[in-house]
Amino acid sequence: MSDTSSLDALIQALRRLPGVGVKSAQRMAFHLLQHDRAGAQVLSQALAQAATQVRHCERCHTFTEGAVCETCLDPARDATRLCVVETPADQAAMERTAAFKGLYFVLMGRLSPLDGVGPRDIGVHNLLERASDGVVQEVILATSFTAEGEATAHAIGEALKRRGVHVTRLARGVPVGSELEYVDLGTIAHALADRR
């Protein structure tokens, strides 16, 4: 289809997004071209600008436009506490709680031997260096509670402990506002074991 090669290219480009299949990509492309060409231009410009301007923070690896992100530069943050998260989205979730006032280290992934993702790929060497700088007193492992997230937390925790760093892990438990009968058994078991 030479007369729709631009449309096909747009659909294929949209399919690169996580969770977007052919049908969703087509729907988005058709919407932008049929109903929101101005929005398509805004999206195109924002994407191009982000692709050239956004990079990784030299200290925590999150996304930033400067060499060091605003969180790392904030003198009000508690530099003795370092929270390790998998993604910038996880960091944003932690920030929305307003409960953590320390600094972060964003792995930009998690260990996954089956996918060829090892410690070097997620910056564990940088994390170990930063956590051993003499300023950090506690590293909070806030990786997800999936098999890969648990493996990542375990590997990092063991490496940090060998360096004499105090390591804690986010607690697991029953979500606030949930009814016990609807909570999965694994969550109940962990909540019971980790009770205080």
From Swiss-Prot:
Disulfide feature: none
Zinc finger (C4-type): 57-72
Coiled coil: none
Domain of life: Bacteria
Keyword Hydrolase attributed: no
Stretches assigned to the Toprim domain: 80-175
The keyword DNA repair belongs to this UniProt entry's keyword annotation: yes
GO function term, MF aspect, one: zinc ion binding
Gene3D superfamilies registered for this protein in UniProt: 3.40.1360.10, 6.10.250.240, RecR Domain 1 (1.10.8.420)
GO aspect biological process, one term: DNA repair
Keywords: DNA damage, DNA recombination, DNA repair, Metal-binding, Zinc, Zinc-finger
SMART domains: TOPRIM (SM00493)
NCBIfam families to which the protein is assigned, alphabetical: recR
Family listed: Belongs to the RecR family.
Chain's role: May play a role in DNA repair. It seems to be involved in an RecBC-independent recombinational process of DNA repair. It may act with RecF and RecO.
Official protein name in the record: Recombination protein RecR
